[in-house]
Amino acid sequence: MNKILIAAASSGTGKTTITLGIMHALKKRGLRVQPFKVGPDYIDTNYHQAITGVASINLDSFLIDDDAMLATLFQKHGESADISVIEGVMGLFDGLGIDRDNSSTSFIAKCTKTPVILVVDGKAISTSAAAIVDGFNRFDPELTIAGVIINRVASENHFSLIKGAIERYTDVPVLGYLPKNAAVALPERHLGLVPKEEMTELETKWELLGDLIAEHVDLDRLLAISKTGAKLTVHPPEIQVPDFSGVRVAYALDAAFHFYYQDNLDFIRSTGATLIPFSPLEEREVPDADFIYIGGGFPEVFAEQLAKNKSMRESILAAHEQGKPIYAECGGLMYLGSSLEMEAESYEMVGVFDGVSKMTTRLRKFGYCIAEPLEDTLLGKKGTAIRGHEFHHSVFETTEPTRMKLTKKRDGKIVKEWHGGYQKGNTFASYLHIHFYQNLLIITHMFGAIER
């Protein structure tokens, strides 16, 4: 199994840009590329899929606290590809707290036995780049940097300086560089990169990026490195897949709602259930289904269009009033509230919950947490520990009672506690994003609410 992992010294170094360029260049060579993303991010994975034509898979060692399960999922998705390309998150050793193996890119590299390519920012640096590479290469005796790519290089002369320094003072090969070019920069907004659903002329950007990588990076050497990763010996955990044949699951999928982990959707299908996508933006009513799943996204960007689609809002509210189970995450919670406010405007939403979503100028919640239902809910029974991730620039102001206690820990200590999650009838919504493979009984529990 050929595999590489693209890591960096820190966020903002150009890791995503380099990764996308490599994926495009390899695909242009006729290779089937299986993309992966370390961590819980949804937007990078959308970009990966746009370029490779293959669904990108999240590898998150906090959301899935089971090394064997992570390795199994990696092997399962990568075994039919010509090469697996993993994009890291933050800096190589950054994770939860100061433990270099706690939810970090380096841990995923070791768990999957994947060679690491380090992206180094070349802006305003020369010989000091060698110190960065040397430090990263020595930091963890169990991990070796297999190659380096330099980003934001001013000229061939500049690249020669950096390459010469790294290869003189370390034994890590420099595979090439990406020159400074504003045309390949990726636009950002409050949740990170702007999703592909909202960007035009993407193909032109990808084409240019892929051509630059093909011109300035030694892809043959990179492919040779991808063959050096140790063979992954997988011991798949025993999985009891429940039988939900005949169950119809309608899930919101459009430019406003598209934050889903591919493995979550795949697992639902593996139970025999049928997934039916629908658009709260474009369609008049929710499809005939036994269960409704509304993931996260950017409802605030499309608030006016969502508000104008009154028939869809009424359709979802009617499904709730009929007792149909509805599960919603983050943007889905905002949609199920009574209204969404932004820039002095108020937009009517579905109205399952009596609450107002208000956009904020700063990040309100960010990071991993463990949720514990305070009573039996659609998400889980009272006291069940559920791992999740929150990341939002909004607050949900409501008098509805909260149904979960959420705890954020760092290095074994509780650093924050709060309450969230709302249940009314058979509808549950919260800001929490979860991965079903942490505990496959989550789906068994949620689908157990379906009248069959």
From Swiss-Prot:
Q: Where is the signal peptide?
A: none
Query: Recorded GO terms, molecular function?
Result: ATP binding; cobyrinic acid a,c-diamide synthase activity
The superkingdom of the source organism is: Bacteria
Pathway it acts in?
A: Cofactor biosynthesis; adenosylcobalamin biosynthesis; cob(II)yrinate a,c-diamide from sirohydrochlorin (anaerobic route): step 10/10
* Marked site positions, Increases nucleophilicity of active site Cys: H433
Identify the keywords attached in UniProt to this record, alphabetized: ATP-binding, Cobalamin biosynthesis, Glutamine amidotransferase, Ligase, Magnesium, Nucleotide-binding
Its Enzyme Commission number(s) read 6.3.5.11
- The broad enzyme category this protein falls into is ligase
Q: Needs which cofactor?
A: Mg(2+)
Query: PANTHER family this protein is in?
Result: COBYRINATE A,C-DIAMIDE SYNTHASE (PTHR43873:SF1)
Q: What is this protein called?
A: Cobyrinate a,c-diamide synthase
What is the species listed in this Swiss-Prot or TrEMBL entry?
Answer: Listeria monocytogenes serotype 4b (strain F2365)
Q: Which gene encodes it?
A: cbiA
